[in-house]
Amino acid sequence: MASKRILKELKDLQKDPPTSCSAGPVAEDMFHWQATIMGPSDSPYSGGVFLVTIHFPPDYPFKPPKVAFRTKVFHPNINSNGSICLDILKEQWSPALTISKVLLSICSLLTDPNPDDPLVPEIAHMYKTDKNKYESTARTWTQKYAMG
């Protein structure tokens, strides 16, 4: 069941890739993908290329995939391990969602952080109290880690 669904999503992604994202299996393992997200142009992550790993559980799509950033990113909803605080990857997951939708949600999270549900409270606090400092730090990290 899971592998059939994953294969279908891969075909759909190749046919109609989401803007500024790409994804596919690592080697022959259909349950382990790598994705690339281009930093949105209207964000401090602009120009960056962010690597993301995707692990599908055996009972996908009834359980959400585990998605994590491999590239360091300065963001209130993404911690130093690359974990992402995104409702659709947790309690808001639905089998109707696809990897394509997940990648688009991550792109919009880069553009519009959610400081009220932070994974990194210090960055959320900076975002709320000194947005210029947050944006310049995020830009610096993007240049340092995502423009290799």
Swiss-Prot record:
It comes from Arabidopsis thaliana (Mouse-ear cress). Its EC number is 2.3.2.-. Transmembrane segments: none annotated. Residues 1-147 form the UBC core domain. Interacts with CHIP. The active site is at residue 85. This is SUMO-conjugating enzyme UBC9. Disulfide bonds: none annotated. GO terms for biological process: protein sumoylation. Accepts the ubiquitin-like protein SUMO/SMT3 from the E1 complex and catalyzes its covalent attachment to other proteins. Mediates the selective degradation of short-lived and abnormal proteins. Highest expression in young stems and old leaves. Lowest levels in floral buds, anthers and young leaves. GO terms for molecular function: ATP binding; transferase activity.
